[in-house]
C-alpha cells in the first residue's frame, strides 16, 4: 500500500511552483517556472532513445555501489554500461520501458530513473511485472524532491501499463534507500545470497 505521506508530498510541487506539460511525443514537465530559464528544473520522459544520456550518471551510481559493497565491489567496478544498455533495450522490445530525466537549465542532467514493465512466468502463470531498474540523482540536487517525483511518476506509469507486481532491487550497502521506497509501498521481501567466485 502506498504511504499517504508520499501521495500528499509528491502530488504537489514546492511552494510557488508552476507546472506545464508540453503536448509532444514525449512528456515535458517544467518546475520552478518563476525562476530564470538557465536555473529551471524540468522532467522529460522518453524510452530507449534516452539511454545514451544517462551513461555518465549511471557510472557514478555504479561507482557509489562499489564503494558501499562489502562483498561484490569488483562486480560494480567492472560493470559495463553497454551491457546494461542492452538489458534495457531488450526490456523495451519485450515489454515497455520508461526513462525520465531531471534536467536543469539547458541540458544538465541532475538525475534519472529507468523503469520497465515486462511479462514474468511464475507458478501462477504469466503476469506483468513493473520494475524500477535504476535511479540516481547527483548529490548536489538531492533533498529537492526529485526522487519522490520520479517515484510517483513510475508508480503512475506502472498502473497505466497494468503491472500486477512492482519490484526494485537494492544493493547490500545501500540500505539507507529502503525507507524512501517504503513510501511507495515497496517493502523488503527476501535476501538474495550469491556465491563469491575467486575471480570476484
Residue ranges: model-predicted function:
Residues 101, 108-117:
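Conserved beta-strand in the GNAT
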Residues 119-132, 142, 189:
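A conserved beta-turn-beta hairpin within the catalytic core of GNAT-like acetyltransferases
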Amino acid at each position: 500500500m502506498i504511504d499517504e505521506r508520499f501521495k500528499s508530498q509528491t502530488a504537489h510541487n514546492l511552494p510557488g511552483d508552476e507546472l506545464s506539460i508540453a503536448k509532444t511525443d514525449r512528456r515535458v514537465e517544467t518546475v520552478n517556472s518563476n525562476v530564470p530559464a538557465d536555473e529551471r528544473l524540468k522532467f522529460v520522459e522518453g524510452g530507449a532513445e534516452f539511454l545514451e544520456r544517462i551513461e555518465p550518471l549511471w557510472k557514478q551510481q555504479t561507482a557509489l555501489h562499489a564503494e558501499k559493497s562489502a562483498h561484490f565491489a569488483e562486480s560494480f567496478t567492472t560493470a559495463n554500461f553497454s551491457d546494461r544498455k542492452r538489458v534495457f533495450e531488450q526490456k523495451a522490445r519485450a515489454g515497455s520501458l520508461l526513462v525520465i530525466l531531471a534536467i536543469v537549465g539547458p541540458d544538465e542532467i541532475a538525475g534519472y530513473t529507468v523503469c520497465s514493465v515486462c511479462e514474468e512466468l511464475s507458478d501462477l502463470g504469466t503476469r506483468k511485472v513493473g520494475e524500477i531498474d535504476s535511479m540516481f540523482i547527483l548529490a548536489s540536487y538531492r533533498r529537492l524532491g526529485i526522487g519522490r517525483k520520479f517515484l510517483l511518476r513510475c508508480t503512475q506509469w506502472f498502473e497505466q501499463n497494468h503491472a500486477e507486481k512492482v519490484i526494485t532491487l537494492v544493493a547490500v550497502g545501500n540500505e539507507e534507500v529502503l525507507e524512501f521506497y517504503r513510501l511507495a509501498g515497496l517493502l523488503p521481501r527476501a535476501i538474495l545470497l550469491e556465491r563469491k567466485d575467486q575471480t570476484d
